[in-house]
């Protein structure tokens, strides 16, 4: 196989690949065998039709076309590996030449234009040091968390006063346009100030007592008259306020497994400290990545960036063509950081020779599927059909690259070393974690294990 590479941009390359006949012949034979299983030729059993007869029956062009479709991904992957090119998107492939008959010695020749990861050099990981803020927990933090727990055990009691923000009102609603009733609801329970129904409802309800009513103008948000202005009459049937339980030992026993309020507070503080330490580890990880990126002028692949910006805008609930300059800027900044982080972590994973097995990918995807209530088997099959397995593999590698990378870096808090092994993992902890990962997810994914090929780099990021 002959490969030539022309760099169109720092992040874009065009490969011209010429496949030797002895490399292409096996694909022709496989294509003939597959077609032989599908055709009927008198005197021959299915699957046992000679190759020459297959060529005659369906035409060499059909055989060669099937062979080319199977050969291109393999030859492209080999070319990427040989030329050390790391793609960041699906290639644009064009067949330039191919044999037109069994006797034609024309070689298969095709081009592949692809956006690639640019070349850059990571800094030396040894001896790096960074100071991280101390993970502090205040009494206010504990009281706020306790207040949230207390809120969950609140009860609603009727009140004989005008409604105010935070109250729960039982209301009847009637909407009219041009004097005609277009919608009505009765006995609706609504938290005043929540803003979950019509615009203007919160303001209309504040100050009303049970039995009182008022009318306000609003825009209807559903039904046949969605988007129309309407006069909305609201009547208050009852007003209830939240009554919070006393903070005492009885509350601690009702809300937790602890006997006293002091024990409950101690547990809350312990949990908040664990959360703070987790955030501290995340800050350390982000600082590690930022340090790797310092001084690196990494060009971003334009096509990949544009597609990601469009997806980012969609996630913000904005159509790309209708985005304001501020929204577009926000999306572009988020994508630029995301892309740069991905490329740096990919390079780090290669530098550290991070290994990712099929089981690792299965467990990773299985956990995602479970989070979204999906069947892991079906989820993985869908990713395979869309060519995204390689992306998942790289995501696992990026995550794993951070652990050994951060271990080589010294983190300090107030001048004292910070131990992040509990969050970033030691080799022993990672090995144990792998054993403890979801067996169910791996078993569910095993049905597609035979079809999962190694990452050929053609997956879109």
From Swiss-Prot:
<comment type="similarity">
    <text>Belongs to the FKBP-type PPIase family. Tig subfamily.</text>
</comment>
<dbReference type="GO" id="GO:0015031">
    <property type="term" value="P:protein transport"/>
</dbReference>
<dbReference type="GO" id="GO:0005737">
    <property type="term" value="C:cytoplasm"/>
</dbReference>
<keyword id="KW-0413">Isomerase</keyword>
<dbReference type="GO" id="GO:0003755">
    <property type="term" value="F:peptidyl-prolyl cis-trans isomerase activity"/>
</dbReference>
<keyword id="KW-0697">Rotamase</keyword>
<keyword id="KW-0131">Cell cycle</keyword>
<dbReference type="GO" id="GO:0051301">
    <property type="term" value="P:cell division"/>
</dbReference>
<dbReference type="Pfam" id="PF05698">
    <property type="entry name" value="Trigger_C"/>
</dbReference>
<dbReference type="InterPro" id="IPR008881">
    <property type="entry name" value="Trigger_fac_ribosome-bd_bac"/>
</dbReference>
<dbReference type="GO" id="GO:0051083">
    <property type="term" value="P:'de novo' cotranslational protein folding"/>
</dbReference>
<dbReference type="InterPro" id="IPR008880">
    <property type="entry name" value="Trigger_fac_C"/>
</dbReference>
<dbReference type="InterPro" id="IPR036611">
    <property type="entry name" value="Trigger_fac_ribosome-bd_sf"/>
</dbReference>
<protein>
    <recommendedName>
        <fullName>Trigger factor</fullName>
        <ecNumber>5.2.1.8</ecNumber>
    </recommendedName>
</protein>
<dbReference type="Pfam" id="PF05697">
    <property type="entry name" value="Trigger_N"/>
</dbReference>
<dbReference type="GO" id="GO:0061077">
    <property type="term" value="P:chaperone-mediated protein folding"/>
</dbReference>
<dbReference type="Pfam" id="PF00254">
    <property type="entry name" value="FKBP_C"/>
</dbReference>
<dbReference type="GO" id="GO:0043022">
    <property type="term" value="F:ribosome binding"/>
</dbReference>
<feature type="domain" description="PPIase FKBP-type">
    <location>
        <begin position="166"/>
        <end position="245"/>
    </location>
</feature>
<keyword id="KW-0132">Cell division</keyword>
<dbReference type="InterPro" id="IPR027304">
    <property type="entry name" value="Trigger_fact/SurA_dom_sf"/>
</dbReference>
<dbReference type="GO" id="GO:0043335">
    <property type="term" value="P:protein unfolding"/>
</dbReference>
<dbReference type="GO" id="GO:0044183">
    <property type="term" value="F:protein folding chaperone"/>
</dbReference>
<keyword id="KW-0143">Chaperone</keyword>
<comment type="function">
    <text>Involved in protein export. Acts as a chaperone by maintaining the newly synthesized protein in an open conformation. Functions as a peptidyl-prolyl cis-trans isomerase.</text>
</comment>
<dbReference type="InterPro" id="IPR005215">
    <property type="entry name" value="Trig_fac"/>
</dbReference>
<dbReference type="InterPro" id="IPR001179">
    <property type="entry name" value="PPIase_FKBP_dom"/>
</dbReference>
<dbReference type="InterPro" id="IPR037041">
    <property type="entry name" value="Trigger_fac_C_sf"/>
</dbReference>
<dbReference type="InterPro" id="IPR046357">
    <property type="entry name" value="PPIase_dom_sf"/>
</dbReference>
<keyword id="KW-0963">Cytoplasm</keyword>
